[in-house]
Amino acid sequence: MKPTTIASLQKCKQEKKRFATITAYDYSFAKLFADEGLNVMLVGDSLGMTVQGHDSTLPVTVADIAYHTAAVRRGAPNCLLLADLPFMAYATPEQAFENAATVMRAGANMVKIEGGEWLVETVQMLTERAVPVCGHLGLTPQSVNIFGGYKVQGRGDEAADRLLSDALALEAAGAQLLVLECVPVELAKRITEALAIPVIGIGAGNVTDGQILVMHDAFGITGGHIPKFAKNFLAETGDIRAAVRQYMAEVESGVYPGEEHSFH
């Protein structure tokens, strides 16, 4: 199978073809996703909650991400594999480069970092040193203590303009992808249309170029609070492979996320 690349996603954006992505943390699920044609995966620091049982992503280390990245890469050798740089792993550009090198050696094609214009220098440095970067704006879980919880971001003109400005700054610095989390649909549309790079949404409506879900949410195995934007595809299909195919089909057709999964 031909490898999926950043250029593949750029082509999807140009052709207005929506694409699905998902988090993955181990060999078996990565192989299953790849076998079903779901070829863009993220080793997210969400593993702190879904795999390790913490109440936030903050305890996750670079070593944790590298371990799971290597496992996912073995399961899906041709996927486009993103890996999060976790909390406090990119406080300076130099630290970001050192930690990015670790997860790239483990098998990542790209690193994802959370934050706006303050990251411009870091994005430039990584890009110049052949480390592709995915930005992450809106609800950035590593900032949960500043936000005072997991809340929708970008409501109101000032907040919306700030997020659009951040998105443009990250793109100008060299970011090649952007994740938008928990923002109003109207803002997600503005940002997606303003950027040349593909935008992946989670809780951002069906107006972005792609979608991502935490796999535990997609299969209804998350304990406790279920995010508004989540949908249990396994409940509808009763089969995990069929659930993956259903998720992809609904994203590609624009059925998911629906109005009931979106914010305004």
From Swiss-Prot:
Pathway: Cofactor biosynthesis; (R)-pantothenate biosynthesis; (R)-pantoate from 3-methyl-2-oxobutanoate: step 1/2. One of its GO terms (molecular function) is magnesium ion binding. It holds the Pfam family Pantoate_transf. It comes from the Bacteria. Its cofactor is Mg(2+). It is found in: Cytoplasm. Binds 1 Mg(2+) ion per subunit. GO terms for biological process: pantothenate biosynthetic process. The active site is at E181 (proton acceptor). It is an enzyme of class 2 (transferase). Its EC number is 2.1.2.11. Gene3D superfamilies: Phosphoenolpyruvate-binding domains. Keywords: Cytoplasm, Magnesium, Metal-binding, Pantothenate biosynthesis, Transferase. It catalyses: 3-methyl-2-oxobutanoate + (6R)-5,10-methylene-5,6,7,8-tetrahydrofolate + H2O = 2-dehydropantoate + (6S)-5,6,7,8-tetrahydrofolate. InterPro entries: Pantoate_hydroxy_MeTrfase (IPR003700), Pyrv/PenolPyrv_kinase-like_dom (IPR015813), Pyrv_kinase-like_dom_sf (IPR040442). GO terms for cellular component: cytoplasm. Catalyzes the reversible reaction in which hydroxymethyl group from 5,10-methylenetetrahydrofolate is transferred onto alpha-ketoisovalerate to form ketopantoate. NCBIfam families: panB, PRK00311.1. Homodecamer; pentamer of dimers. This is 3-methyl-2-oxobutanoate hydroxymethyltransferase. The gene is panB.
